[in-house]
């Protein structure tokens, strides 16, 4: 069984970096990751030992069902995040890796790479999202599931290698759509409403059918 404590501890460190970026040395080697999500665009910076240094994100609606639908908007947000991080760290970032939903590289991988490079970053690697997550989790035999804003992506591993990737169109936005319809509110209001822990007990039975759909996707994998 995979021990998730190390991964969870690293994520806690990353969360702290959002408001408290770490100091870096002049000339220090840094690694960047850019994620264009359905709900958020995120830029993460790590040091040469893989420790979080900075993290910035912005709510965005530039991706639908795992595909970029607003290229200019995506470029603008990515550029702002890069400038914000560079200003905080006092360095110029030069390279990054990007993550995309499984089975979308032929359709959208080049677009995501172009978004990254529009900021002045050289894109050095493209990963499918569950495989990228597994670089931190470290499972050798099993499945890594990424329930994103627009899709649910799954990478199946055997002996540490990816043997199958699956991506289907059900994710967080579908939870919001169901909630918006049930409560008679706008999609944006539903997005905010569902994130409030005080509403979770009320929201759960409303979105249970959507949870069942995600469960079915995972079971089929």
Where would I find each of the regions flagged by the language model?
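Nucleotide/phosphate-binding catalytic cleft detector across ATP-hydrolyzing
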Residues: 1-36, 42-147, 159-168, 172-221
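A structural feature that tracks compact, well-ordered secondary-structure segments
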Residues: 153-155
């Amino acid at each position: 069984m995979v021990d998730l404590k190390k991964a969870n501890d690293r994520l806690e460190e990353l969360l702290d970096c959002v408001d408290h970026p770490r100091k870096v040395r002049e000339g220090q080697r840094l690694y960047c990751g850019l994620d264009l999500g359905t709900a958020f665009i995120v830029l993460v910076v790590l040091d040469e030992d893989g420790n979080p240094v900075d993290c910035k994100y912005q709510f965005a609606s530039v991706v639908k069902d795992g595909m970029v639908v607003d290229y200019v908007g995506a470029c603008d947000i990515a550029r702002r995040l890069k400038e914000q991080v560079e200003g905080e760290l006092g360095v110029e970032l030069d390279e990054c890796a990007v993550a995309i939903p499984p089975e979308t590289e032929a359709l959208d991988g080049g677009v995501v790479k172009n978004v990254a490079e529009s900021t002045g970053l050289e894109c050095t690697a493209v990963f499918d999202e569950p495989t990228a997550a597994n670089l931190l989790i470290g499972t050798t035999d099993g499945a890594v599931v990424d329930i994103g804003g627009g899709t649910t992506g799954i990478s199946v591993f055997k002996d540490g290698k990816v043997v199958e990737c699956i991506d289907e169109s059900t994710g967080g936005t579908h939870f919001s759509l169901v909630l918006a319809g049930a409560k008679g509110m706008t999609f944006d209001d539903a997005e905010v409403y569902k994130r409030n822990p005080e509403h979770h007990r009320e929201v759960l039975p409303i979105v249970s059918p959507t949870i069942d759909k995600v469960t079915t996707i995972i079971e089929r994998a």
